[in-house]
A protein has these predicted regions:
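Pyridoxal 5′-phosphate
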Residues: 1-133
Protein backbone atom coordinates (compact mmCIF):
# COMPACT_ATOMS: atom_id res chain seq x y z
CA UNK A 1 0.00 0.00 0.00
CA UNK A 2 1.45 3.34 -1.09
CA UNK A 3 0.27 5.99 1.40
CA UNK A 4 1.70 8.86 -0.66
CA UNK A 5 -0.24 7.69 -3.71
CA UNK A 6 -3.45 7.43 -1.68
CA UNK A 7 -2.87 10.86 -0.13
CA UNK A 8 -2.60 12.42 -3.61
CA UNK A 9 -6.26 11.46 -4.19
CA UNK A 10 -7.29 13.95 -1.47
CA UNK A 11 -7.07 17.60 -2.64
CA UNK A 12 -7.07 18.90 0.95
CA UNK A 13 -3.60 17.47 1.46
CA UNK A 14 -2.22 19.83 -1.18
CA UNK A 15 -2.78 22.59 1.38
CA UNK A 16 -0.02 23.86 3.61
CA UNK A 17 -0.54 25.08 7.17
CA UNK A 18 2.14 27.59 8.14
CA UNK A 19 4.37 26.05 5.45
CA UNK A 20 3.85 22.52 6.82
CA UNK A 21 1.98 19.60 5.32
CA UNK A 22 -1.56 19.29 6.61
CA UNK A 23 -2.05 16.49 9.13
CA UNK A 24 -5.70 15.69 9.81
CA UNK A 25 -6.60 13.53 12.81
CA UNK A 26 -10.33 14.19 13.26
CA UNK A 27 -11.84 11.76 10.76
CA UNK A 28 -14.36 10.46 13.30
CA UNK A 29 -15.88 13.93 13.16
CA UNK A 30 -15.47 14.86 9.50
CA UNK A 31 -13.68 12.69 6.97
CA UNK A 32 -11.72 14.31 4.19
CA UNK A 33 -12.89 13.25 0.75
CA UNK A 34 -10.91 12.00 -2.24
CA UNK A 35 -11.41 13.95 -5.48
CA UNK A 36 -13.56 11.20 -7.01
CA UNK A 37 -16.02 11.56 -4.11
CA UNK A 38 -16.00 15.36 -4.31
CA UNK A 39 -16.69 15.14 -8.05
CA UNK A 40 -19.54 12.67 -7.55
CA UNK A 41 -21.11 14.77 -4.78
CA UNK A 42 -20.87 17.84 -7.01
CA UNK A 43 -22.55 15.94 -9.86
CA UNK A 44 -25.33 14.77 -7.54
CA UNK A 45 -26.02 18.26 -6.18
CA UNK A 46 -25.77 19.81 -9.65
CA UNK A 47 -27.92 17.34 -11.60
CA UNK A 48 -29.70 14.81 -9.37
CA UNK A 49 -30.47 16.35 -5.99
CA UNK A 50 -33.75 15.60 -4.27
CA UNK A 51 -34.94 14.32 -0.91
CA UNK A 52 -34.74 10.57 -0.50
CA UNK A 53 -37.95 8.64 0.13
CA UNK A 54 -40.12 11.75 0.25
CA UNK A 55 -41.82 12.01 -3.12
CA UNK A 56 -42.66 10.24 -6.37
CA UNK A 57 -41.32 12.73 -8.91
CA UNK A 58 -38.44 11.73 -11.17
CA UNK A 59 -35.57 13.25 -9.17
CA UNK A 60 -36.88 11.92 -5.84
CA UNK A 61 -37.26 8.40 -7.21
CA UNK A 62 -33.79 8.53 -8.79
CA UNK A 63 -32.22 9.82 -5.55
CA UNK A 64 -34.02 7.15 -3.52
CA UNK A 65 -32.84 4.42 -5.89
CA UNK A 66 -29.27 5.71 -5.68
CA UNK A 67 -29.47 5.76 -1.88
CA UNK A 68 -30.85 2.23 -1.66
CA UNK A 69 -28.35 0.93 -4.24
CA UNK A 70 -25.60 2.40 -2.08
CA UNK A 71 -27.03 0.56 0.93
CA UNK A 72 -26.85 -2.68 -1.09
CA UNK A 73 -23.26 -1.95 -2.15
CA UNK A 74 -22.24 -1.40 1.47
CA UNK A 75 -24.06 -4.59 2.48
CA UNK A 76 -22.03 -6.57 -0.04
CA UNK A 77 -18.78 -4.79 0.83
CA UNK A 78 -19.01 -5.60 4.55
CA UNK A 79 -20.79 -8.94 4.00
CA UNK A 80 -23.90 -7.98 5.99
CA UNK A 81 -26.75 -10.49 5.95
CA UNK A 82 -29.41 -7.95 4.96
CA UNK A 83 -29.29 -4.48 3.44
CA UNK A 84 -31.58 -3.26 6.22
CA UNK A 85 -28.72 -3.82 8.66
CA UNK A 86 -27.03 -0.83 7.03
CA UNK A 87 -27.85 2.48 8.71
CA UNK A 88 -26.42 5.73 7.38
CA UNK A 89 -25.72 8.51 9.87
CA UNK A 90 -24.22 11.98 9.56
CA UNK A 91 -21.12 10.98 11.51
CA UNK A 92 -19.63 9.16 14.45
CA UNK A 93 -21.45 11.26 17.06
CA UNK A 94 -24.88 10.50 15.65
CA UNK A 95 -23.98 6.83 15.16
CA UNK A 96 -22.71 6.45 18.73
CA UNK A 97 -25.79 8.19 20.13
CA UNK A 98 -27.99 5.84 18.12
CA UNK A 99 -26.17 2.73 19.34
CA UNK A 100 -26.19 3.89 22.97
CA UNK A 101 -29.89 4.76 22.86
CA UNK A 102 -30.89 1.47 21.22
CA UNK A 103 -28.82 -0.58 23.64
CA UNK A 104 -30.02 1.49 26.59
CA UNK A 105 -33.70 1.24 25.72
CA UNK A 106 -33.76 -2.37 24.61
CA UNK A 107 -30.91 -4.39 26.08
CA UNK A 108 -29.00 -2.85 28.97
CA UNK A 109 -30.36 -3.33 32.47
CA UNK A 110 -29.56 -1.91 35.90
CA UNK A 111 -26.20 -3.27 36.98
CA UNK A 112 -24.88 -3.80 33.44
CA UNK A 113 -21.57 -2.16 32.64
CA UNK A 114 -20.31 -0.54 29.45
CA UNK A 115 -16.54 -0.26 29.40
CA UNK A 116 -14.77 2.46 27.47
CA UNK A 117 -11.22 3.72 27.77
CA UNK A 118 -9.99 7.09 28.97
CA UNK A 119 -8.70 7.59 25.43
CA UNK A 120 -12.18 7.67 23.88
CA UNK A 121 -13.25 10.58 21.74
CA UNK A 122 -15.78 12.78 23.53
CA UNK A 123 -18.48 11.58 21.11
CA UNK A 124 -18.09 8.05 22.51
CA UNK A 125 -17.99 9.13 26.15
CA UNK A 126 -21.04 11.42 26.33
CA UNK A 127 -23.80 8.99 25.18
CA UNK A 128 -22.72 6.36 27.71
CA UNK A 129 -22.43 8.97 30.45
CA UNK A 130 -26.00 10.16 29.84
CA UNK A 131 -27.25 6.60 29.58
CA UNK A 132 -26.17 5.77 33.09
CA UNK A 133 -28.30 8.58 34.57
Amino acid sequence: MNIDKIKKEFPIFDEKIQNNDLVYLDSANSSQKPKVVIDRINEFYSKEFSNVGRSVHYLAVAATNLYENTRTSVQKFINAKDKNEIVFTKGATEALNLVANILGQNYLQDGDEVLITELEHHSNYVPWHFLRK
